[in-house]
Design a protein with these regions (language model features):
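Beta1/beta-strand and adjacent pyrophosphate-binding region of the FAD-binding site
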Residues: 1-12, 166-176
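Glycine-rich flavin
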Residues: 2-4, 20-27, 32-166, 199-203, ...
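Flexible, glycine-rich terminal cap/loop adjacent to redox cofactors
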Residues: 7-14, 18-35, 40, 47, ...
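Short hydrophobic core segments
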Residues: 7-9, 113, 128-138, 173, ...
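Hydrophobic "anchor" residues
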Residues: 48, 121, 272, 299, ...
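A Rossmann-like FAD-binding core segment of flavoenzymes
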Residues: 107-110, 114-122, 190-295, 365
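FAD-site-proximal beta/loop scaffold in flavoenzymes
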Residues: 150-167, 258-331
Length: 453
């Protein structure tokens, strides 16, 4: 029997950060990982995707080089090198986390964890006990019940990130964050991309006006969108040249259509990873979207917590990180002032989009009075200098005192601009206080400052 102060199941951005923070504050920690250190985010999610986003940005820059006086020819995309660079970035960061897990006080265990009781976890034949346990097992792709969903070539983001050949034609089912990022990446790399989405607009958590403008910007680069369309089936057949292809049948307003592709990416959502944990043995309640937790991320079992995607509250890597830090502080008997109601997020398309707080849709649905202030990149000096004038910021404030309710944007470096708003919202700042902050000239952040005046 191995006893420690804290057991953490999962070494993603929630688990490994919590482990390091706990150990540096004097707790003995056992962290259990079934796959690779760093979890889905590092190995099969955020980091490899953002690496490919950067590759795609470079390709787009070369395509526009003549406008900057540089006569450059793009030539063929060396997809093997693209993927090699992605693997190198992931490997380097994984090595860093593995080193971090050697911090005194941390015991890193490879294997699959399974509850024996509320405070005992088995990994193979070894038993580990602790007063406090954090479940941080993340999420996995959710496959919808579509005919032909198991046909070879129908993949999730995990398999797409492991491709060895650039697909000539890529069909993406779902226009959420994952679908939109891959649409942007693969269209830049040269694939013919088709996106099929059931909803009226892409990116449902983003302000619908911003989402529409972003979709239109990506459409101009050749991505074909079919919105309000439901996929009916996927089948495999031989093309006219004898090659194998996938045919996706979808329906829009009662009219059936088909699109052919070499690869079909299913990006219709994710679900909590709880299989094999044997939660029943610990009496832990699990709901439709994940493990049920309170506002301190504690389950119905005292001393057992669930953070990140596995609790289904907010499927963002940084949400997992800060939930983990909050839990460790609670275990240590310390307070914090983390505002989980202020959660910035970003979509790394080209151009990128980002948000924090309420959207105009949220405010209208809730019947909240607000003032919307809009700013456009096209009138900003830095945006013109960068040839990045396609962008917009929407800032929502209360009419009576100008308190900031939210900000949604798309355009170059919008994720950085949104972080400024997140900092202000954490302090309940008003738009007049934003107006008093000196902004460097020339910067894209001046778009935000201009609409505060």
């Amino acid at each position: 029997m191995n006893n420690s102060d804290l057991i953490i199941i999962g070494s993603g951005p929630g688990g490994y950060r919590a482990a390091h923070f706990a150990a540096t504050n004097g707790l003995s920690v056992v962290i259990i990982e079934a796959k690779e250190a760093g979890g889905t985010c590092l190995n099969r999610g955020c980091i490899p995707t953002k690496t490919l986003c950067r590759n795609a940005e470079v390709v787009e820059t070369v395509r526009k080089a003549a406008a900057f006086g540089a006569e450059a020819s793009l030539g063929a995309i060396d997809f093997a090198k693209v993927m090699e660079r992605k693997d190198q970035v992931v490997s380097q960061l994984r090595s860093g986390i593995e080193l971090l897990m050697q911090t005194p006080g941390i015991t890193f265990v490879k294997g699959t964890a399974s509850f024996k009781d509320a405070h005992t976890v088995a990994v193979g034949d070894e038993l580990y006990t602790a007063k406090n346990i954090i479940i941080a097992t993340g999420s996995e792709a959710k496959m919808p019940p579509i005919e032909g969903i198991n046909v070879p070539g129908v993949v999730t983001s995990t398999e797409l990130l492991a491709l060895t050949k650039l697909p000539r034609r890529l069909c993406i089912i779902g226009a959420g964050v994952i679908g939109m990022e891959f649409a942007s990446i693969f269209s830049s790399l040269g694939s013919e991309v088709k996106v099929i989405e059931f909803l009226k607009e892409c990116l449902p958590t983003l302000d619908s006006d911003i989402a529409k403008r972003l979709r239109q910007a990506i459409s101009k680069r050749g991505v074909d969108f079919s919105m309000q369309s439901g996929v009916k089936s996927i089948r495999e057949e031989n093309a006219e040249d004898g090659s194998r292809q996938l045919v996706v049948t979808f329906e829009k307003k009662g009219k059936a259509s088909e699109v052919s592709a070499d690869i079909v990416l299913v990006a219709t959502g994710r679900r909590a990873v709880v299989e094999g944990l044997n939660l029943e043995a610990a009496g832990i309640e699990c709901g439709r979207t994940g493990i049920v937790v309170d506002d301190n991320f504690q389950t119905n079992v005292e001393g057992v917590y669930a953070i990140g995607d596995v609790n289904g509250r907010c499927m963002l890597a940084h949400a997992a990180t800060f939930q983990g830090l909050h839990v460790v502080r609670r275990i240590l008997g310390k307070e914090d002032n983390i505002r989980f109601d202020i959660m910035p997020s970003a979509i790394f398309t080209t151009p990128e989009a980002a948000s924090v707080g309420k959207s105009e849709d949220n405010l209208k649905d809730a019947g909240t009075e607000y003032v919307c202030r809009k700013g456009f990149y096209r009138s900003n000096g830095k945006a013109l200098a960068m040839d990045a004038t396609d962008g917009m910021i929407k800032l929502f404030v209360t009419p009576e005192d100008g308190r900031i309710l939210g900000c949604h944007a798309y355009g170059a470096h919008s994720s950085d601009i949104i972080q400024e708003v997140a900092a202000l919202m954490n302090k309940d700042a008003t738009v007049s206080e934003l107006a008093d902050i000196i902004h460097t000239h020339p910067t894209l952040s001046e778009v935000l400052h201009d609409i505060s005046l």
